[in-house]
Amino acid sequence: MQKATSNKSILRILSLALVLLILVGMLSVGVSAESASPLKGTSVTLGSELVVNFYAEVMDTQGAAMTFCIDNDTKTIPVTQARLVEDNLYVFSCAIAPAQMTKNIEATLVDSGNTYQTSTSVRAYAEKLFASKQWDKLAAGDMMVATLNYGAAAQECFGYNTENLANAGYEKAATAEIPQAEASQMVSGSVSGISFYGASLVFETRIAVRFYFTVKGNIEDYNFSIGETPVAKDNMYYVEVPDINPQDYAENITLTVNDKMTVTYSPMQYISRMYNKTENTQLKALIGELYQYHLTAVDFLADPYGNDKDNLVSAQ
C-alpha cells in the first residue's frame, strides 16, 4: 500500500504551486484546497494555453484515470500521463479556450474501482479565491481579473455564451494604450524557391505565431529551425510556433530556413497592428484585453505576491 500524503503536506505543496509554476515559465494564481476526498484541489495555469489543474491522491498508479467533460466534449487522461507532485499526489490538467471560462469542467476520477467527481470553472475558481478576502490584495488577484476580462472579451468576440460573461461583477480597468509596433517583421538572407509572406498571431485555444511562406517545389526541401510541421493553406504553407506565454508577447521570435534565411517577428507586432487597424469593435476589445493580460502577466512575474505576501494563504 502506498503512503498517503498528509493534509499538511498537501497544503504545503498547493501553497507552493504558484512559485513552482512560475519557475517553469507559466503563471498560476493559487490553489483552492479540498480535503474530504482524493480530489484535493484545483489551480489555474496561464501559459500559451489556459489550463485548469485538478490535484488528486491516486492509489492505482498504473490504471487510474481522470475524464474531463466540457461542452459535451470529453477527454481522458491516464495517471501515467499526469504529473506526479509528491508521493501519490498527481496533477491532471485540462486545457480550455479563453471563451470557456464560465463553462463547468466536469472531472471524474476512476481509481481502484472507485469513482469520484468534482466540477469547476475558471470563473468559479476565481470566486473561491476572492472569497478568501486576501487574494484581491495580491498581484495574483490582478492577474485573475485580467484573465476574466480577457475571457469575457473572447466570449463577446466569438459570440459564445455571452449571457454569462467571465468578468461579470468585477470592475474592469481601463485598457492601456497599445503603442505602435516599432518594426515590422524582419527578413534577412534568402533561399531559392521559398519566400516569406507574412506572420499572424493565433489566439484561439492556445497562443501561437504562424509564419507563412510561398513555396515553389517540395516543402520537404526546406528545414525550419523552430516550429511544428509545415501545414498547407491557401496555396501557401505556415509553420506554427506554439508555447507563447503571455509575459513574452514583446519578445522576438526568430525562425531560420535552411540556415540561410532568417525571419524575426514578435506577437506584439501583430497586437499593435491589428488593434490600430481593425474597425471591428469586438475584435479590437479582445486584442486590447490580450494586451492588458500581457502587461499584468509581466507585473505578476516581477512580484507575484504584491505588497501583501505575508498574508498569502490557500483558499479553503
Positions of PLM-derived features:
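N-terminal secretory signal peptides that target proteins for export/translocation
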Residues: 1-9
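Sec-dependent N-terminal signal peptides
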Residues: 8-23
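Sec-dependent signal peptide cleavage junction
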Residues: 23-37
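Short, surface-exposed linear motifs at loops/turns and structural transition points
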Residues: 34-316
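Generic detector of short, well-ordered, non-transmembrane alpha-helical segments enriched
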Residues: 18, 27-29, 220
